[in-house]
Structures are given as structure tokens and as C-alpha cells.
């Protein structure tokens, strides 16, 4: 067993008290990314090693694996703690997105180790989609490369505002301050083109030797800033969703018996209280919150990120994919939008193609109307293209089969982010971030009688194969 962990548990007064203390720590999700062999996996292994998160059996296994697959001679190859796939160990690269967990006395962390090779950019985008901070590794011998620019742009495109530029392998350039200063200046010049108001920090380090990772380096006395671990422990993550209006996508209608009907999901943004008036989209029907049910019992209020079940005072028609928001909020469903796309399939994305798209719990179909441009990640310029290739990033105009309640991605990633699904293979082929909504052709408001609405709901519920259109959602089909 990890002796440090055992000591922490003893200090807290037992396992239960330790687990409660862990629950109250803040959580930081971050990813490591950069060019091939910049030392991403080694850095994560060093963090785990120097924060004493490795168990004795893991350390013993690491010694054996280092002899068979290691690339560091007689030294421990800390990258093997993360490179779990056999193909990764044999090739000496990271292929899949590897997730690891560790904690310190101040904070707990979830790490995503993402691939450096260009052909695995789609894997990197997947890892970045849930993170608050990105560590961009740069080889001190090579400086800023194309893949560094690509990963920087993808990170900011996916809403990451905190970038830590870790200039690694300083031991191979004799820990020279001028090398660090030159790379820092080069990156800041490039970063002027990145979108948004970014928090960028620079740390010179050596993941292999441990310099400035968890402890200050005696080899770089010219650097007076914090270590990488200190940056991770103290960075103030301001999540935009905490300040946004309430959004609650319904993931599941929970009805275990005739006396209970609740709507389960994760509160995407804002907060909700018992007694608050809410509105359901796309129907527009209003009700009020009777209960907020959680695993730990009922609550009076829930905040963004909490998994909850809402019980309403009225028995109304709500299905998976519907969106609940405050009754006084206005969010007009849209059928047209401009979407930033990261394409992940071998077959290029082209105008005229149709895909299934999934947004929160909602699944519908969409058609590609036009590709506005592809972004050249070397200089972040826009160029006209007829199609978007594998790993291509560009702006696309789309039309949905039915009006969707959408937010701008930078304001709310949950209700502004979607994935493209191939209709034949059911494989995820792309990721989309809503840039701009277009309300042209919005369906005019039509008043239906209560009988018409109830009959329509009855037919759609019990005879889905009729493909009856939703009178309130403008879902076209044959009645």
C-alpha cells in the first residue's frame, strides 16, 4: 500500500473521514499535449511519482517494464506509468487518451494524456473537451512547432482559457535561460492570434530529472516562478457555466413506480431551487420545481455540474433530449447554425452530406449546407476548401431537421457542443462547437387545442413507427 496515502488516512481519522475530505477538495481537469516525444507521458509519470501517488506493486512493475520497454537506460521510464497500450509501449508513443487521477493536500486532479502525432489529433480534441486547463509541452531543443500551434488552437477552440506552456528537456540545453526566453517570446507572438482572453503561464522544467515539476530546481536559479505543481494547485478556474442562466438537459425520465416521475440529468449551467418556475423546450410549457432529488437525499438548491432528478408540480409531457430553463429566460430554438468543426473521419466532410447529431441528450439529423473555410493551423489563416479532411478544423453552416435549443459554445459547452454520428456505422466522426445561431426560417408560433396536443403526444408515444411530427417541436414526418 502507498505509505503516504496510509498516513493521510490516519491523519484524517479513518477511511470515511478521508473520503469526505476528498469530496470537498476542488477538482481540476487538465490535459497534456504537444508535439511527438516532447515528454507528455514522462511528465505525468513524474507528477505521480513526486507526489507519492505510486503504490509499491506499481513501482515494482515499473522497474520490470523499464527494463523491457524503457527508453531511459538504467533509469526508471516514468512514461510507462501512462502508456498502457501494448502498441504504445512498443512504438514509444501515446496513441489513446490516457486518464489518470491524483490528489495533493490542496486539490484533486484528473489528467488526460493526449497523443502528439498529427494523425491522432481527433483523440486530443476528445481529451480537451472536458478540461479546464492545458499543459502545452515544448521541447527546449526544437521550440514552437506546428503541432504546438494546432493543439493550442484546439484547446482554445474547445473553451480552455488557462494554458501552461511547459518548456521541457531543459537539461538537454544546459538549463540556459536564453533558450527559455526565446521560446517564451516565440509562443507569445503566436498566441496573439488565439481567440479569447487567455491566462498563459510559462514553466521551464525537466520531466525526466524532476526539475521544477513538483520541487524547485537547483539548476535554474534564474527562474523564480512557481513549479508546475504549484501552478496546478493554485490556478483559479472561473467556469463560465456558473455565471450562465439555468440549463438542464433531460437525460432520462425516471419513473420507478406510479407515484414518482422525475427528470434526471446533470445541471449544465446556473442553479435551480425548489419552487422555481421553469420552462420546457421545445414545447414552451411551464411548471415549477417540487423536489430536487439526489443520491444523498433531497436538496433545496442545486448548482452547475450536479447530477440531480427534478420532480415538477405538474404532469406534463417531457422526454429525453428536452431542455429545462428558467421560465423568464428566452431561448429561441434554431434550425440553422454556424458550427466550428473538428473532423475525425477518413471520409471528408462535404456539403450535401447528412449526419445524425447528438447534443446533450438530444439526437436528431443535420445537413451540411456549406463549408465556409478551413483553418490553416500553421498561421491560423482561413482558406477556401470544398471539403474538410481528417483532422481538419473549419467553420461549417448546418441545417437541423428540427429546431434545437442551442447556446453559443463559449458560453455553455453542454448546450453548445455536439457530435456528428455516421448513420450507417454509428461511429462518431466529428465534434462541433456552435459559433453563431441563424433564426431564418423559424417556425411561426401555432396555437393548438389541449385535445390536439394530447392526441399528438399519445400517437408519438405509442405509435413511434408512424413517425408523426411533433406539433410543438416541428418534427416533420408522415402522420
From Swiss-Prot:
Q: Which reaction does it catalyse?
A: sulfate + ATP + H(+) = adenosine 5'-phosphosulfate + diphosphate
The segment annotated G5 runs over 206-208
Q: What is its EC number?
A: 2.7.7.4
Pathway where it operates: Sulfur metabolism; hydrogen sulfide biosynthesis; sulfite from sulfate: step 1/3
Q: Does the keyword ATP-binding apply?
A: yes
Question: Per UniProt, which keywords does this protein have?
Answer: ATP-binding, GTP-binding, Nucleotide-binding, Nucleotidyltransferase, Transferase
Q: Where is this region: G3?
A: 113-116
What residue spans carry the region label G2? 92-96
- The tr-type G domain is annotated at 25-239
Q: Which PROSITE patterns match?
A: G_TR_1 (PS00301), G_TR_2 (PS51722)
Q: InterPro entries of this UniProt entry?
A: CysN_GTP-bd (IPR041757), CysN_II (IPR044138), CysN_NoDQ_III (IPR044139), G_TR_CS (IPR031157), GTP-eEF1A_C (IPR054696), P-loop_NTPase (IPR027417), Small_GTP-bd (IPR005225), SO4_adenylTrfase_lsu (IPR011779)
Q: Where is this region: G1?
A: 34-41
Entry annotated with the keyword Transferase:
yes
Q: Which residues form a coiled coil?
A: none
Q: List the residue ranges of the region (G4).
A: 168-171
Write out the GO MF terms. ATP binding; GTP binding; GTPase activity; sulfate adenylyltransferase (ATP) activity
Q: Main EC class of this protein?
A: transferase
GO terms (BP aspect): hydrogen sulfide biosynthetic process; sulfate assimilation
Q: Sum up the protein's function in the record's words.
A: With CysD forms the ATP sulfurylase (ATPS) that catalyzes the adenylation of sulfate producing adenosine 5'-phosphosulfate (APS) and diphosphate, the first enzymatic step in sulfur assimilation pathway. APS synthesis involves the formation of a high-energy phosphoric-sulfuric acid anhydride bond driven by GTP hydrolysis by CysN coupled to ATP hydrolysis by CysD.
Report the NCBIfam families cross-referenced here.
CysN, PRK05124.1, small_GTP
PANTHER family, per this entry? Answer: TRANSLATION FACTOR
Which HAMAP family does the protein's record reference? Sulf_adenylyltr_sub1 (MF_00062)
By sequence similarity, the record places it as follows: Belongs to the TRAFAC class translation factor GTPase superfamily. Classic translation factor GTPase family. CysN/NodQ subfamily.
Task: Give the record's subunit note.
Answer: Heterodimer composed of CysD, the smaller subunit, and CysN.
List the protein's name. Sulfate adenylyltransferase subunit 1
| Source organism | Salmonella heidelberg (strain SL476)
Amino acid at each position: 500500500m502507498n505509505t503516504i496515502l496510509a498516513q493521510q488516512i490516519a491523519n484524517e481519522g479513518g477511511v470515511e473521514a478521508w473520503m469526505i475530505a476528498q469530496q470537498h477538495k476542488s477538482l481540476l481537469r487538465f490535459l497534456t499535449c504537444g508535439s511527438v516525444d516532447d515528454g507528455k507521458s514522462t511528465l505525468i509519470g513524474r507528477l505521480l511519482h513526486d507526489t507519492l501517488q505510486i503504490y509499491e506493486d506499481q513501482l515494482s512493475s515499473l522497474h520490470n517494464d523499464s527494463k523491457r520497454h524503457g527508453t531511459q537506460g538504467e533509469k526508471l521510464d516514468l512514461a510507462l506509468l501512462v502508456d498502457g497500450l501494448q502498441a504504445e509501449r512498443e512504438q514509444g508513443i501515446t496513441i489513446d487518451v490516457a486518464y489518470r487521477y491524483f490528489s495533493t493536500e490542496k486539490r484533486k486532479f484528473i489528467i488526460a494524456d493526449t497523443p502528439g502525432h498529427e494523425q491522432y489529433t481527433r483523440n486530443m480534441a476528445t481529451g480537451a473537451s472536458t478540461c479546464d486547463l492545458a499543459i502545452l509541452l515544448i521541447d527546449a531543443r526544437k521550440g514552437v512547432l506546428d503541432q504546438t500551434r494546432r493543439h493550442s488552437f484546439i484547446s482554445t477552440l474547445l473553451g480552455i482559457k488557462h494554458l501552461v506552456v511547459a518548456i521541457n528537456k531543459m537539461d538537454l540545453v544546459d538549463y540556459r535561460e536564453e533558450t527559455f526566453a526565446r521560446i517564451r517570446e516565440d509562443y507569445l507572438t503566436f498566441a496573439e492570434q488565439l481567440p479569447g482572453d487567455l491566462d498563459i503561464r510559462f514553466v521551464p522544467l525537466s520531466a525526466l530529472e524532476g526539475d521544477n515539476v513538483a520541487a524547485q530546481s537547483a539548476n535554474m536559479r534564474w527562474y523564480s516562478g512557481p513549479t508546475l505543481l504549484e501552478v496546478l494547485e493554485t490556478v483559479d478556474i472561473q467556469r463560465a457555466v456558473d455565471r450562465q442562466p439555468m440549463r438542464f438537459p433531460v437525460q432520462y425520465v425516471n419513473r420507478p413506480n406510479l407515484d414518482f416521475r422525475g427528470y434526471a440529468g446533470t445541471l449544465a449551467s446556473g442553479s435551480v431551487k425548489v419552487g422555481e418556475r421553469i420552462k420546457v423546450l421545445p414545447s414552451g410549457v411551464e411548471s415549477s420545481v417540487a423536489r430536487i432529488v439526489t443520491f444523498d437525499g433531497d436538496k433545496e438548491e442545486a448548482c452547475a455540474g450536479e447530477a440531480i432528478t427534478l420532480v415538477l408540480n405538474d404532469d406534463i409531457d417531457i422526454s429525453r433530449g428536452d431542455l429545462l430553463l428558467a421560465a423568464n429566460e428566452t431561448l429561441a430554438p434554431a434550425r440553422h447554425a454556424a458550427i466550428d468543426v473538428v473532423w475525425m473521419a477518413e471520409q471528408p466532410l462535404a456539403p450535401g452530406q447528412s449526419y445524425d447529431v447528438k447534443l446533450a441528450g438530444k439526437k436528431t439529423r443535420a445537413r451540411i449546407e456549406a463549408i465556409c473555410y478551413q483553418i490553416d493551423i500553421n498561421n491560423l489563416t482561413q482558406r477556401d476548401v470544398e471539403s474538410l479532411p481528417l483532422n481538419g478544423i473549419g467553420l461549417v453552416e448546418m441545417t437541423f431537421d428540427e429546431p434545437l435549443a442551442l447556446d453559443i459554445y463559449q458560453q455553455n459547452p453542454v448546450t453548445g457542443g455536439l457530435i456528428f454520428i455516421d448513420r450507417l456505422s454509428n461511429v462518431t466522426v466529428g465534434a462541433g462547437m456552435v459559433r453563431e445561431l441563424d433564426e431564418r426560417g423559424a417556425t411561426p408560433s401555432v396555437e393548438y387545442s389541449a385535445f390536439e396536443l394530447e392526441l399528438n403526444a399519445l400517437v408519438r408515444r405509442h405509435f413511434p413507427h408512424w413517425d408523426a411530427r411533433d406539433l410543438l417541436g416541428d418534427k416533420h414526418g408522415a402522420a
